[in-house]
Amino acid sequence: MNLSFPQFNRAMVTALSLLLVSFSSLADRTITDQLGRQVTIPDHVNRVVVLQHQTLNLLVQLDAIDDVVGIQSSWKKQLGPEFARFSSRLSTLPMPGDLTQVNIESLLAEHPQVVFVANYAPQEMINQIEKAGIPVVAVSLRRDSQGEQDKLNPKMGNEEQAYNLGLQDGIRLVAKVVNREPQGEALIDYTFAQREKVTQRLKDIPESQRVRVYMANPDLTTYGSGKYTGLMMKHAGAMNVAAASIKGYKQVSIEQVLAWNPQVIFVQDRYPDEINKIRNDPAWQSIDAVKNQRVYLMPEYAKAWGYPMPEALAIGELWMAKKLYPARFTDIDINKAANDYYQRFYRTSWVPEPHASVE
């Protein structure tokens, strides 16, 4: 076949364009994870294994669950069995590892392009995955100083800055890996705009008049300073009774709780049995929160975890603030606020849990 010069040029341009598209799909890019590591990943990622539940939650909200080919074995324990409703795929996905261990054969069977891990994943685990030729991206949702990035209970000069900037960094990192940058920015913008509305309503409350709050976990464990939980309380207008003497996540004694005498006690939704234990145990009856029936089970979105989640900032802090200062939030329908968030980022309706204190 004879081609004229213009036809030949067009054919060459078409061929080169196809080659460029082909090579671009195989090209690499370098990102920096939240351990400060330079990680080279494919230009287009659509097969990831997620061995950290916070990152799995973010991927669902970024509308990237279809890119997930494997998840951690404890995801139901960490996120709650109700989390499965956000995608029918969740209950069918392989589970080649967990927060601190991996089955390398099972992992390789899923052919992932990237594996997400927690910042405290053992170095041996990271090395094992990387030696198999798979890039590892660590997520902490904190902005830490040098030498603190891989710690579960890091030293922090400024908790507010560490978690606020760290959450934004983490969302942007995860969104960048799975090519969902616009969704990541939308999630950040909405989260912090909603939080600011709560801040404005509570800004005139003096520290000395803040409600004394205790976060009750099983076996008398609680969160002190250095965790997002304390910041959640602060932004909701509370004073965390454990913050002054406890760092991180630790067990305390009933005598210590009695001495703190919290006015309100919160329990995370994943520990519903703790509510009746506290309400019915004679040892707790002299505490103000129990006497005044201010012991509340939190809804699933009010994640008072050590690590921040966007829904906790956007609507969880609002829920907590409304419980602590109802007169300041009489115009707020918390279920509507929750539904707005769920429709926007989970693409489903918020259904109040029958056991949680959602009103």
Regions found by a protein language model. Name each.
Residues N2-V13:
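Bacterial N-terminal signal peptides that target proteins for export
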Residues S22-S24:
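N-terminal signal peptide c-region/cleavage motif recognized by signal peptidases
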Residues Q38, M125, E130-N217, T221, ...:
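Extracytoplasmic substrate-binding proteins
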Residues V49-L51, V69-Q72, V114-A118, V136-S140, ...:
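Structural recognition of the beta-strand scaffold that forms the well-ordered cores
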Residues V50, L56-L108, V114, V137-R142, ...:
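A short, structured surface patch at a secondary-structure boundary
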Residues K76, Y228-Y249, S253:
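Alpha-helical, coiled-coil/dimerization segments enriched in small aliphatic residues
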Residues P96-L99, N103-Y120, S253-R270:
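Proline-aspartate-enriched helix->loop->beta-strand connector
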